[in-house]
């Protein structure tokens, strides 16, 4: 996985219409609101647009991939980036504060609590007690933050892996977590939320967020593909094309300009966090992208939306290129071919997503695509590895 040099993670960017499930994604101070029943009815027809489990790869003699994962969340910088992501943090804050009926006098479990910001929001909304689980060294800071802000009697920070700790209570009423990674599923924290759900969530309990969806579109990106991929053809007069193949397999995480979008935005996969199983995070789905103008296509771009459907009114946010930028940005999958496409022509194919066998926090992606157009005919399969 790569990132553009100099690309920022701030949430500056124009608001625009997001096109998932016909939901209205708003400015983070308002958050998305819509009729949940109506939105659910459109999902099937739509074509628009930190802790881990077992099986960790051993790295070196005494550290697993999980150890490195948790170590990364011990650094302040990553938490600063997430807290400064206004779309992310304000959306969660608004969901909690504007729907206090979900939290008032309830037992809440915060999975992957980090600095404890979501736990603090829940406590302020009237939660009876919040159990904040955090495996990294940030748990020590979270305890101090909770104490400093006067919530030690409401929030209990527990340091450890969700799969290894025991709660002082048999069941909780609410599980809240910000588990999403790049490409929605990178880092595989979702399985930890599902483990907590199955072990501790009471009958009639709520998981927040409870819906997530993955989307795909196609873009023109000649300039950066030239800089990132074609660069290896001639490096100061030397042929380094052996690296080019590896560079093609590494998805790029970056903010895509909405003007680069050439096709519609296609819903790939919808996940119901309250009902799904860990196996549902591995899937093969078809797609059909229709060109909205004559142009070249250099890459496909994936992004995700999340929804909180148990609120008074449905709320959520999008990480799409037509929405305000987030620290998740978008995931760019460069194509070996440059596709010359005319308005109305279609790229058809399928995407297979699976956790890596050696390290389930990583993702393997298989992309099959075909275009049979007036100016371009191509059919190809490519493999990508998010590491």
UniProtKB/Swiss-Prot annotation:
Where does the record place it? Nucleus
Q: GO annotations under biological process?
A: chromatin remodeling; methylation; regulation of DNA-templated transcription
Domain SAM-dependent MTase PRMT-type span(s) in chain numbering: 66-387
Q: An example Gene Ontology cellular component term from the record?
A: nucleus
Q: Which keywords belong to this entry?
A: Methyltransferase, Nucleus, S-adenosyl-L-methionine, Transferase
For whether the record's keyword set contains S-adenosyl-L-methionine, the answer is: yes
Q: Which domain of life is it from?
A: Eukaryota
Q: Where is the active site?
A: 178, 187
Bias-annotated ranges (Low complexity): 34-44
Q: Which reaction does it catalyse?
A: L-arginyl-[protein] + S-adenosyl-L-methionine = N(omega)-methyl-L-arginyl-[protein] + S-adenosyl-L-homocysteine + H(+); L-arginyl-[protein] + 2 S-adenosyl-L-methionine = N(omega),N(omega)-dimethyl-L-arginyl-[protein] + 2 S-adenosyl-L-homocysteine + 2 H(+)
Q: Segment Disordered: which positions?
A: 1-60
Record keywords: Methyltransferase included?
Answer: yes
**GO molecular function, a single term:** protein-arginine N-methyltransferase activity
**What is the stated purpose of this protein?**
Arginine methyltransferase that methylates (mono and asymmetric dimethylation) the guanidino nitrogens of arginyl residues present in target proteins.
Say which family it is in.
Answer: Belongs to the class I-like SAM-binding methyltransferase superfamily. Protein arginine N-methyltransferase family.
Q: What is this protein called?
A: Protein arginine N-methyltransferase 1
């Amino acid at each position: 996985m790569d990132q553009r040099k100099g690309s920022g993670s701030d949430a500056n960017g124009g608001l625009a219409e997001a096109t998932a499930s016909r939901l209205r994604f708003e400015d983070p101070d308002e958050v998305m609101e819509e009729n949940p029943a109506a939105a659910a009815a459109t999902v099937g027809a739509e074509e628009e647009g930190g802790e881990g489990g077992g099986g960790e790869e051993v790295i070196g003699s005494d550290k697993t991939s999980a150890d490195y994962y948790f170590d990364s969340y011990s650094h302040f910088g990553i938490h600063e980036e997430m807290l400064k992501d206004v779309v992310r943090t304000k959306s969660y804050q608004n969901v909690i504060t504007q729907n206090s009926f979900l939290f008032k006098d309830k037992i809440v479990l915060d999975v992957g609590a980090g600095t404890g910001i979501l736990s603090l929001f829940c406590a302020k909304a009237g939660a009876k007690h919040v159990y904040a689980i955090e495996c990294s060294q940030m748990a020590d800071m979270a305890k101090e933050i909770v104490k400093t802000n006067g919530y030690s009697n409401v929030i209990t920070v527990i340091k450890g892996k969700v799969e290894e700790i025991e709660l002082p209570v048999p069941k909780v009423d609410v599980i809240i977590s910000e588990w999403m990674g790049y490409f929605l599923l990178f880092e595989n924290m979702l399985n930890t939320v599902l483990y907590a759900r199955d072990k501790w969530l009471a009958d009639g309990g709520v998981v927040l967020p409870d819906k997530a969806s993955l989307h795909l579109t196609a873009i023109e990106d000649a300039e950066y593909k030239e800089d990132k991929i074609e660069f290896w053809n001639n490096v100061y007069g030397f042929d380094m094309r052996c690296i080019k193949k590896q560079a093609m397999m590494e998805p790029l995480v970056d903010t895509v300009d909405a003007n680069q979008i050439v096709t519609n935005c296609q819903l790939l996969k919808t996940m119901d966090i309250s009902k799904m199983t860990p196996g549902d995070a591995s899937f093969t789905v078809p797609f059909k992208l229709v060109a909205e103008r004559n142009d070249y296509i250099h890459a496909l771009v994936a992004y995700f939306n999340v929804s909180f459907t148990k609120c008074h009114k449905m709320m959520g946010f999008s990480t799409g290129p037509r929405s305000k930028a987030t620290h998740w940005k978008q995931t760019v999958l460069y194509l070996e071919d440059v596709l010359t496409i005319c308005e109305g022509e279609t790229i058809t194919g399928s995407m297979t997503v699976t956790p890596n066998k050696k390290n389930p926090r990583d993702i393997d992606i298989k992309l099959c695509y075909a275009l049979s157009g007036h100016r371009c005919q191509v059919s190809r399969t490519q493999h990508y590895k998010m590491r």
